[in-house]
Amino acid sequence: MTGEGRSAEQGIDMTKWLTGVKVAATAALVGLALAACSPKTETKTAAAPAAKTYTVGWTIYAGWMPWPYAEQAGIVKKWSDKYGVDIKVVQINDYVESLNQFTAGKLDAVTSTNMDALTIPAAAGKDTTFLMIGDYSNGNDGIVLKGGATLADIKGRPVNLVENSVSHYLLARGLESAGLKMTDVKVVNTSDADIVAAFGAPETKAVVPWNPQLTEIKKMPGAKQVFDSSKIPGEILDGLIISTEVAKANPNLAKALAGIWYETTMLMNQQDAAGQAAREAMAKLSGTDLAGYESQLKTTYLYYDPKAALAATISPDLVTANDKVRKFSFTAGLFGQGAKSVDDIGIEFPGGKILGDPKNVKLRFDPTYVQMAADGKL
């Protein structure tokens, strides 16, 4: 999905705090004679505790490859040094697992879609901030049939996808466009890491993947894409979410993350040797070549410039799109068993607009740091 929804088998070991303070023993002077023959001792200063390392998790998706590239290219270090924070960027092999780790506090920030930010950490009670909207899926997520011609042919088939992710949402929107319902298909939960292999199995009849897996599946025998996210522009958003508590306590971290992101995206958008080199590196990091990666970028409406991202963040369209997403999420039971209404979880937007319970805001779209980037104040 636009990364979307984009799940790792392994956890991450966080950097451990240094413990213990070294103290040198000091010999007592008993007299001038003893002092003259006794060995000298040095008094050591207690070591300062190590600075906290903030961990940012990412999974493979065209719109999220700037993060590992920024780490590789030294851009993360540059902005970390500027703001006096220690940032570690780590890959998680499974998208849903990355969000579970964020929810559990093992990651301070993570790449996510708007829907998954709502239905995983926010629904679990974790106050979450969408620090930056990076892109929206403009064809990066799709429904692919095996041996079918149109979306109507999906009726009665099992459909493999990352359950309860934006892939699930895309399927629902696609079915709606074809006059079908979710009860017309059977969802088979499949990790994003396994979905390409799953399509090759005889029993698999339909899948809903995102790039780069979508591109690979479309090349396979019998594959036919019958619907994609370009039909619902602006609804599947990808970006970086951060713990609201962490962001409030460490504004320099948020500033550094915004600086890292926009320096990297503006570089990759350059139509020169430097821009091409950045895109080539991102392609390699995502397991494809330059042509393959640039093909994926064509179906990713990426906000390379902070001014464009700011406009999207403060637009009324953001509220409209997320209203559709939250209604689907509640209907699908993704708010949890205790949720009684679509308004149980509050979502706050720029300007103070809130969808849902204003006393239980758990997802926030904060334009503060995008605004700083747009104003050149980072």
Where do the model's predicted regions map?
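C-terminal motif of bacterial Sec signal peptides marking the signal peptidase cleavage site
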Residues: A33-A36
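Bacterial signal peptide processing site
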Residues: S38-K40
